[in-house]
């Protein structure tokens, strides 16, 4: 099971209803943060997410609404006597900005902070990978892909029966080693399992104009969290952001399962934005959501379920 928790769903500045961008991805007990806008630690407290479970932070770019919560988050970790290292990833200048935080005031963390400046790369971890790709925002900026590793196919009862295998330690050994000797023959894992199952894929663009790289990296994503700051091109002006229509078109072309319209400009109320976005997305046939603060998208058995932590009283 994987969960995407929207700690801050607004853009540019906080409002009474929405905080600035911060997204937590919860997977197998780990919390991965994508952007840490001002007040992220408070949002985590409200969502009952422990900062001590955060091992990796991925920052898309260094406009204040996407990273100013980093200092408070690190200091809170220190107050809680954190010992394990923290890894911070981001575009060019990440090292400089993080060092500025660490050198400000009378504060030194009691744990290691490792900074990684990225271009376009693929980071491999135990059960998943993180891919970074360049987006168009007028400054060094990255989008990110979380890609769970593909899983083995399910054991096929008829194949197990064919080889005289039953559930138990022997199947555990087969899964671990990839093959076993049984009744005088070698049985491989693929002999008794179905097709490999594709791991879940989540893409976050950060702030960006429409660009072909997003479509390429979002191909067949289960969830695309796309900058959709404005309802219309006329509202955009000279900013390096996307409209709802542009986000929908990217999702349609990339054959995305679910589109999350993110970074809504503070000029729009939720109802106003929902009304306008619904018309646009329905015309393109895109399945979409407009996240609010503390919305949770849970991916299980190939489907997304949406709930809100505060409304559910969790």
Curated annotation (Swiss-Prot):
UniProt KW Nucleus keyword: no
Annotated Gene3D superfamilies: Ribonuclease Z/Hydroxyacylglutathione hydrolase-like
Xref: SMART domains: Lactamase_B (SM00849)
SUPFAM superfamilies, per the entry: Metallo-hydrolase/oxidoreductase
Sequence positions that bind Zn(2+) 1: 61, 63, 137, 207
InterPro entries given in the database record: Metallo-B-lactamas (IPR001279), RibonucZ/Hydroxyglut_hydro (IPR036866), RNase_Z/BN (IPR013471)
Function: Zinc phosphodiesterase, which displays some tRNA 3'-processing endonuclease activity. Probably involved in tRNA maturation, by removing a 3'-trailer from precursor tRNA.
This protein's name: Ribonuclease Z
Gene of this entry: rnz
């Amino acid at each position: 099971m994987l969960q995407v928790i929207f700690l801050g769903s607004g853009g540019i500045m906080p409002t009474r209803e929405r905080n600035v961008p911060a997204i937590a991805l919860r997977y197998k007990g780990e919390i991965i943060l994508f952007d840490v806008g001002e007040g992220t630690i408070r949002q985590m407290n409200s969502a009952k997410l422990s900062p001590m479970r955060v091992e990796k932070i991925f920052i898309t770019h260094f406009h204040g609404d996407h990273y100013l919560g980093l200092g408070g988050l690190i200091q809170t970790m220190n107050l809680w006597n954190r010992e394990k290292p923290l890894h911070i990833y981001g575009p060019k200048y990440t090292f400089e900005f993080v060092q500025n935080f660490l050198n400000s005031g009378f504060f030194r963390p009691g744990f290691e902070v490792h900074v990684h400046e990225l271009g376009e790369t693929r980071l491999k971890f135990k059960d998943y990978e993180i891919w970074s790709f360049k987006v168009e925002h007028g400054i060094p900026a990255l989008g990110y892909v979380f890609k769970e590793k593909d899983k083995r196919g399910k054991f096929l009862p008829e194949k197990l029966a064919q080889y005289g295998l039953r559930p138990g330690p022997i199947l555990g050994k087969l899964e671990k080693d990839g093959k076993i000797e049984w009744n005088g023959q070698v049985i491989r894992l693929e002999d008794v399992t179905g097709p490999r199952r594709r791991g879940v894929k989540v893409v976050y663009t950060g702030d960006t104009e429409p660009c072909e790289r997003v479509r390429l990296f979002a191909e067949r994503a289960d969830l695309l969290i796309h900058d959709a700051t404005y309802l219309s091109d006329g509202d955009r002006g000279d900013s390096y952001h996307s409209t709802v229509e542009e986000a929908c078109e990217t999702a349609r072309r990339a054959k995305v399962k679910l589109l999350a319209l993110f970074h809504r400009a503070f000029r729009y109320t939720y109802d106003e934005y929902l009304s306008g976005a619904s018309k646009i997305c329905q015309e393109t046939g895109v399945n979409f959501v407009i996240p609010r603060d503390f919305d949770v998208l849970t991916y299980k058995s190939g489907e997304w379920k949406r709930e809100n932590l505060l409304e559910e009283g969790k």
